[in-house]
A protein has these predicted regions:
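Glycosyltransferase-associated regions of secretory-pathway enzymes
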Residues: 1-66, 71, 81-225
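Short acidic donor-binding loop at the edge of a beta-strand
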Residues: 76-79
């Protein structure tokens, strides 16, 4: 597999100077090729037999990135990172995929507070995720083998979730790049924070824990905006 990392900046929010500096350094530090995807270039990667969900157009910039990274990891594989400070090379982490039993390489969730908050009807699953948080991968950076049972189920669950949200998305499209359910106490955008990211990704990590590697260092989570 090519040692290529995808980064996304989607939506109409301008990138801050700090984010731009972080993006400029990712290739140098990771020792990997970086492909930067924007609204202007993303259509080049959408496969004719696998179009984006109808609801994509109504998403915020953040949730567009959540959707896109799942799509790219399934159809293309390779690395993904948030546009944050990276401290270490990724070359050895990519080498973990030399083992065919490894499907996803990432870093362990930092603490139990990083576990995605599922909907109330999934209380039992939520308890299991919180109990086993140390086995979950963080959402900020990872490397995926394409077209595995993990990524296939990821896309299936993502599109099913988007189907459920679609009627409300049409009524209440995102107001800004970081919109989420209840933002500022008034947002009617239907998707909660991590609603199409960790809420899908974390249960899959627990299901396919035997196919995970934890050989990636996390990005920096402070002072990145």
């Amino acid at each position: 597999m090519d040692k290529r990392i995808f980064c996304f900046w989607l939506g109409n929010s301008p990138m801050s100077e700090r984010r731009q500096q972080n993006l400029d350094r990712i290739s140098q530090i990771t020792k990997c090729e970086v492909t930067f995807i924007t609204d202007d270039t993303i259509s080049e990667y959408i496969k004719p037999d696998a179009p984006f969900h109808e609801g994509y157009q109504y998403l915020s910039g953040t949730t567009k990135c959540d959707y896109a990274r799942a799509y790219f990891m399934h159809h293309y594989g390779g690395g993904y990172t948030d546009i944050k400070i990276i401290y270490y090379p990724w070359t050895l982490s990519f080498d973990e995929l030399d083992d065919p039993s490894i499907w996803v390489v990432g870093y362990r969730e930092i603490n139990g507070g990083g576990v995605a908050r599922l909907s109330p009807e999934k209380k039992e699953l939520q308890e299991q995720l919180c109990k086993n948080w140390g086995y979950l991968l963080g959402n900020g950076a990872f490397i995926c083998r394409p077209n595995t049972p993990f990524t296939r189920e990821w896309m299936d669950e993502l599109n099913k979730t988007m189907d459920e949200y679609l009627p409300e998305l049409k009524k209440n499209p995102a107001r800004d790049s970081r919109d989420c359910l209840g933002k500022d106490g008034v947002s009617m955008f239907p998707i909660p924070w991590a609603g199409i990211a960790g809420c899908i990704f974390h249960p899959l990590c627990m299901k396919y824990v035997d196919h995970l590697s934890y050989a990636l260092y996390p990005p920096e989570f402070v002072d990145y905006l």
